[in-house]
């Protein structure tokens, strides 16, 4: 019996310039480039073992063997590496998620980035991180950006080979995030379904794609300048424009809950009345992420704590 083992840790990320909509659904090539901040506090550890002792792939998540449907998705991803290497041995995948699901943080980004990294090691491919990100992308679009720390761009590209992650900045300055947990309930409309509806029906969508390119260029300059006000303002504007495309879809849909609006208003009040640079962004869900200086997190938590219970506030 022969086996090869690979072990990798990958961190989740929060998009500041959003990805919303696919140009190529099969290859997960997006309609626009995006940019995220990797969260060092939240990650997935994955171990893979390629072995001829198995007749089918096995997938364990947090110690529990997963069902056929979940394993089938993993198998499709593993097949990308089998196709590249010619190694058809079945694989045991063991993943541990250290991502607070109650915070509404998608673990798919860190999960598929970690799986790609582990397979890269076990198969002996040893692809550089940028090239490996083209594999991670095929599992989950946002996983493309989880191969690097700090600020990371997912360059849209126009092919499987060049739609990849590009490290922008190590984020080694005074920047942090707070997650406001509004709801941990399952979304009524999945991100995939929401994207498809928006792309096909929203009259605002074309403008969103154009403006996202401008936002990306602007935020990269703001990052270079270490300007937290500009970083936050651009991210807030970009996120709200994305949600506006959904409101104009047919039929319209919205991920906001009443508490999402309260959180937005509270953050604006902190910014305008306390003079603390605090900005918000939201993904395809009701939870709100606060972009701020890491040194301001205690003061912002104090203000948010007047509105939300402490267990709903997660600093990173």
Residues covered by each model-derived region:
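ATP-binding N-lobe of GHMP and related small-molecule kinases
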Residues: 1-103, 117-127, 303, 314-316
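C-terminal nucleotide
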Residues: 3-10, 169-316
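Fold-independent oxyanion-binding glycine-rich loops
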Residues: 10-13, 19-20, 96, 109, ...
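Short, glycine-/Ser/Thr-/acidic-enriched flexible segments
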Residues: 13, 21, 42, 53, ...
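Short, solvent-exposed loop/turn segments at the edges of secondary structure
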Residues: 30, 39-41, 147-149, 173-175, ...
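Conserved hydrophobic/aromatic beta-strand scaffold that supports enzyme active sites
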Residues: 45-47, 151-153, 177-179, 289
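Short amphipathic alpha-helical segments
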Residues: 69-73, 111, 128, 259, ...
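Gly/Ser-rich oxyanion-binding loop with an adjacent helix/lid
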Residues: 83-172
């Amino acid at each position: 019996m022969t086996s090869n083992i690979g072990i990798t840790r990958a961190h989740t990320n929060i998009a500041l310039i959003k990805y919303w909509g696919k140009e190529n659904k099969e290859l997960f090539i997006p309609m626009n480039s995006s940019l995220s901040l990797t969260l060092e506090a939240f990650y997935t550890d994955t171990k893979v073992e390629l072995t001829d002792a198995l007749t089918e792939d096995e997938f364990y998540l947090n110690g529990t063997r997963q069902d056929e449907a979940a394993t089938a998705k993993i198998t499709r991803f593993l097949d990308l590496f089998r196709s590249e290497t010619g190694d058809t041995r079945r694989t045991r995948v063991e993943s541990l998620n250290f991502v607070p699901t109650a915070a509404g943080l998608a673990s798919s980004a860190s999960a598929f980035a970690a799986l790609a990294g582990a397979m890269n090691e076990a198969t002996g491919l040893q692809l550089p991180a940028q090239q490996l990100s083209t594999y991670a992308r095929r599992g989950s679009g946002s996983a493309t950006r989880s191969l690097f720390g700090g600020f990371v761009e997912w360059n849209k590209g126009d092919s499987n080979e060049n739609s990849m992650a590009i490290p922008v900045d190590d984020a080694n300055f005074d920047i942090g995030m707070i997650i406001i947990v509004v709801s941990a309930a399952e979304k009524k409309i999945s991100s995939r379904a929401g994207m498809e509806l928006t792309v096909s029906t929203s009259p605002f969508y074309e403008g969103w794609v154009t403006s996202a390119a401008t936002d990306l260029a602007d935020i990269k300059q703001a990052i270079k300048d270490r300007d937290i006000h500009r970083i936050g303002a651009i991210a807030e504007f970009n996120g709200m424009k994305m949600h506006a495309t959904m409101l104009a879809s047919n039929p319209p849909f919205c991920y906001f809950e009443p508490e999402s609006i309260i959180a937005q208003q509270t953050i604006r009040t902190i910014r305008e009345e306390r003079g603390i640079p605090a900005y918000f962004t939201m993904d395809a869900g009701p939870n709100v992420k606060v972009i701020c200086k890491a040194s301001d997190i205690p003061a912002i938590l104090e203000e948010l704590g007047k509105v939300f219970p402490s267990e709903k506030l997660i600093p990173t």
